[in-house]
Amino acid sequence: MTYDNIVTGTFLKRPNRFIAYVEVKGDVKTCHVKNTGRCQELLVPGCTVVLEFHPKAKEMKRKTEYDLIAVYKGNLLINMDSQAPNQAALEWIREKEAKGLSLENVGIPTNIRREVTHGESRFDLAFELKDEVTGKTVPAFMEVKGVTLEKEGNVFFPDAPTIRGVKHLNGL
């Protein structure tokens, strides 16, 4: 997963969940915030943020030319794009060898699908794993979470109470 046209700026304020005002090269820009979470401990006035500039924003009928995709907290760069973890996980699992996923006698994931409903929950990814010894194929589900809460070098999920998170854990 890659971003194009990356620039940095200085965060000024976030009037609502969807936009932020950021100073870029001396000009104040309205930016789309790609994470609707609170992120209060990250988005503090004066912090350095990373933006993706969209030069064809008007042609694309976008309301903003910039997306706020990451923020520096000290020397840590923290992702703010809530879609990035799912895209990165999908790209990883589609590799011929999904390192770290393979269990003993379990083959490469197949029939990979996004946003799959199972029971009363919808999961980010679903796929099948084949037992190389028995030949049986078993379903597998993956719920991907990005983390934005950092304390003393450790990151946590969630950054606010979430009933949906409990539902996903119970569903898995």
Task: Give the predicted meaning of each segment.
Residues Y3-K13:
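Structural detector for short beta-strands of small beta-barrel domains
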Residues N16-Y21:
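Short aromatic-glycine-enriched beta-strand elements
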Residues V22-V28:
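OB-fold (S1/OB) nucleic-acid-binding surfaces
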Residues K29-C39:
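Short alpha-helix capping/helix-loop boundary micro-motifs
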Residues G37-V50:
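Short nucleic-acid-contacting surface segments enriched for D/E, G, S/T with interspersed K/R
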Residues E52-E97:
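Terminal, basic amphipathic appendages of nucleotide-handling enzymes
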Residues L76-Q83, S102-K145, R164-K167:
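Active-site metal-binding core of divalent-cation-utilizing nuclease and nuclease-like domains
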Residues G153-G171:
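Basic, amphipathic alpha-helical patches used to engage nucleic acids or provide basic targeting signals
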